[in-house]
From Swiss-Prot:
One of its GO terms (biological process) is translation. It comes from Deinococcus geothermalis (strain DSM 11300 / CIP 105573 / AG-3a). This is Large ribosomal subunit protein bL25. One of its GO terms (molecular function) is 5S rRNA binding. Coiled coil: none annotated. The gene is rplY.
Amino acid sequence: MELKATPRKSQEKLAPGMIPAVAYNKEKNVTFAIERKAFDRAFRQQGTTGLFDIVIEGGETFPALVKAVQMDKRRREAIHADFYMVTYGEPVEVSVPVHTTGKSQGEIQGGLVDVVVHSLNVIAPGPRRIPQEITVDVTNLNIGDHVTAGQIKLPEGVKLAVEPDLVVLSVLPPRLSAEELEAQAQAAQVAGMVASGELSEAAAEAVLEGSASLDAVKAGEEGSRAQQETEEASERADQGQ
């Protein structure tokens, strides 16, 4: 996509509607100005993987990729753009967005596909062969499954620029509601109390079934133990007479 620009010296005042920009590589950098609206439209369409032909008025023309965009947070518009100059036919490393397709078996079971890496660094054989996105089919994934960078099929000639064992996405189990989390915590607490002898198995069953509250059962158990201790003390006293 062609993007027209005007030459600009550093700190030079900008014409209305223009934003400063710089393009660079290992050998040189060029400063210029571009129309904000034209850049916004082009960047929404091309992103960081789309190739731009920067045409500087009265100067050179070169291919480049968007490296970074500084935004005005309040107005939500670009205020500065960085481009990286590339050379046709030479490999180039880029960050490509990761998208999923299909509905996983895990999602059907109530789970969730968690995309951990939203953009994957790859090396394309040339600027014109940069993939616009990387698509991962999650249809056959079950809860607990994950996909690593090395398992993703890339376009011909495109190579990974990250470790192949990098986890890109995984399928998580269903999220528990607040009530389910509370019930889970109570079950663990009750199990611990049974193990320590604080609750009888019958009392624990009543709590877990919802027929009695834990506080009520604890009070009842404590009362029973106190009564038993009193009876035992009385029995010992009778035997001592």
